[in-house]
């Protein structure tokens, strides 16, 4: 732990914290930074707890030095950001004492404290042992019940840090996911997005250990999806078709992944899940033609249902088909009505697509 503390002290000494600590009555670093420093993960976020009387003084300190900051909750939570070095500093009011504050934390490895002013670490021995042994364990039996979002955070931490989950904590996480319906969609969304960017091999192992559902057979498929550049297009600014493609597999087994989508994203996922495509020309062409405005919907359906050796072929087909241009001038001159015109154009497109299909 000494190496981790030295890294933290060295990092903080280069920030405004080095001066701030001389102007407050107490300043305790807690949680993720200590954990990440111990595991050798680059430091980005620093969470502090301070006395209520110091909180306003910290705000004034930042204003005077023109350090970018804002308040998420005037009474309880103040988020401060130092733009000079891209670190995020969170300041929260200490809950009476370190012991009481620690008891309200989520997991033991996040309930380790460092007293910045006195340069002393404060933590229970068993909490430090969990960190050293890479064991995810709740601080107390009500930790996840108090805030069900911690169930997803636990899954993510276990994935990202290759943690084993303590037996009773597994039970609490499983119970917690059933309570996510009571959590704001925005908070769930943030955690699920992070989970989607975790190592899927680790995620599959964690989900198996928690819920008994073995998705190991999907790993080659997930790896293939990651390589599909055609699925990189964003549905929203923070979610891509690649993300929805993965989710369309996960939701078949884990309902709690359904709690975070926007209406538009749900429509896409439902189409992906319900679209049935067979591996023959007629079925592929109909899926392509009926989804020309959003070709990625059938591509996602293909990526999650076809044999892996046929997925690449289908993706190549759709890519080539999308580049085919049909000269409609002659059709327009034939005097066909709108319905007849559409049927004729489809027929000509199908002929050209069939040629490409037979060449591959």
Show the residue positions of the predicted features.
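Catalytic cores of the polymerase beta-like nucleotidyltransferase superfamily
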Residues: 1-360
């Amino acid at each position: 732990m000494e190496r981790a503390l030295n890294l933290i002290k060295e990092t903080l000494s280069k920030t405004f914290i080095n001066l701030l600590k001389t102007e407050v009555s107490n300043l305790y670093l807690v949680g993720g930074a200590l954990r990440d420093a111990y595991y050798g993960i680059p430091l980005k976020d620093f969470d502090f707890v301070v006395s209520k009387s110091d909180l306003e003084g910290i705000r004034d300190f930042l204003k005077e030095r023109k350090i970018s900051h804002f308040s998420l909750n005037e009474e309880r939570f103040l988020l401060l950001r130092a733009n000079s070095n891209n670190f995020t500093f969170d300041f929260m009011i200490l809950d009476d004492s370190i012991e009481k504050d620690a008891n309200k934390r989520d997991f033991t490895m996040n309930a380790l404290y460092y007293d910045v002013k006195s340069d002393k670490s404060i933590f229970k021995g068993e909490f430090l042992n969990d960190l050293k042994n890479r064991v995810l364990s709740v601080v107390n039996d009500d930790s996840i019940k108090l805030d069900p979002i911690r169930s997803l955070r636990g899954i993510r931490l276990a994935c990202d840090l290759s943690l084993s989950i303590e037996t009773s904590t597994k039970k609490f996480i499983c119970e917690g996911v059933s309570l996510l319906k009571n959590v704001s969609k925005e908070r769930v969304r943030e955690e699920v997005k992070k989970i989607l960017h975790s190592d899927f091999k680790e995620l599959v192992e964690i989900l198996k250990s928690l819920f008994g559902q073995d998705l190991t057979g999907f790993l080659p498929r997930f790896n293939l999806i990651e390589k599909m550049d055609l699925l990189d297009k964003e549905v929203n600014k923070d979610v891509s078709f690649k993300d929805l493609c993965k989710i369309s597999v996960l939701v078949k087994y884990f309902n709690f992944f359904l709690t975070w989508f926007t209406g538009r994203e749900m429509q896409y996922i439902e189409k992906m899940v319900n679209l049935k495509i067979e591996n023959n020309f007629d079925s592929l062409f109909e899926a392509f033609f009926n989804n020309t405005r959003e070709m990625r919907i059938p591509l996602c359906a293909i990526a999650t249902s076809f044999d892996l050796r046929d997925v690449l072929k289908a993706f190549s087909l759709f890519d080539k088909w999308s580049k085919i241009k049909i000269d409609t001038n002659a059709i327009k001159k034939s005097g066909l009505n709108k319905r007849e015109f559409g049927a004729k154009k489809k027929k000509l497109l199908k002929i050209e697509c069939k040629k490409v299909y037979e060449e591959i």
